[in-house]
Amino acid sequence: MSLCLVLPLIVGCHYREDSGIPLPEGKIAFDRIAVAPFQQVAPEESLGGAVRCPLCGMTFNATGSPGHPEQVLERLFLEELEKERPKLNVISGERVAGVYRRISSDSLTISQREVLQRVGSELGAEGVVAGYVYRFRERKGVSYTVEQPASVTFEIHLLRVSDGALVWRGSFDKTQSSLMENLFLFASFFRGKGKWVTAEELTGEGVEQVLKTFPGQP
């Protein structure tokens, strides 16, 4: 009987990908970056389906989420970025959003990459960060027992303004599962303190992971 009471608390995370990847050769370092408004990318079908990243074209299995999960991701990213790169000059918020909206509406025929490049150029930034949420499924239940665990998929890109190159990519795709289902996930188990986490908590874990390889300053 006691074993049955303990099992719901032994939880880890099942994941497909959890990485931050510096793409080009050589060291990438910026002093001033702009953070464009993060976006939720949802499939046309309400039950979910495949979508493509607006920047790199990679395919993700996505589901639409209520609320504004893109704002959650952007907030957590900015908080962690300030902690990890305190000397980095970051432009964010309405200042960037206003420029982004204007350039997007005035330039309907250009690609998303070109829009971001123009945004960065106008703001005097060397790089522009863009983030996309593909899945933000909240847990159904409470911290010690759930009907359905939290599941999160997101991707963050860093674009170099001078040539439009995507110089860094951080991707996170994770669904929490019991430790009994996957005994190799002790690290996630201890990070989550042996409980079923919320989608925001899982997103925070992902942001922390991908920012480990985010380019530094010159």
Predicted regions and their residues:
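General secretory precursor processing signal
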Residues: 7, 16, 56-59
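N-terminal segment of the mature soluble domain
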Residues: 39-134, 161, 165-169, 200-214
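Sec-dependent bacterial lipoprotein signal peptides
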Residues: 1-13
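Short low-complexity, flexible loop/linker segments enriched in glycine and/or proline
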Residues: 105-106, 144-147
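Extracytoplasmic/secreted cell-surface and envelope-processing proteins
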Residues: 45, 138-143
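Short structured motifs
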Residues: 19-20, 114-116, 139-140
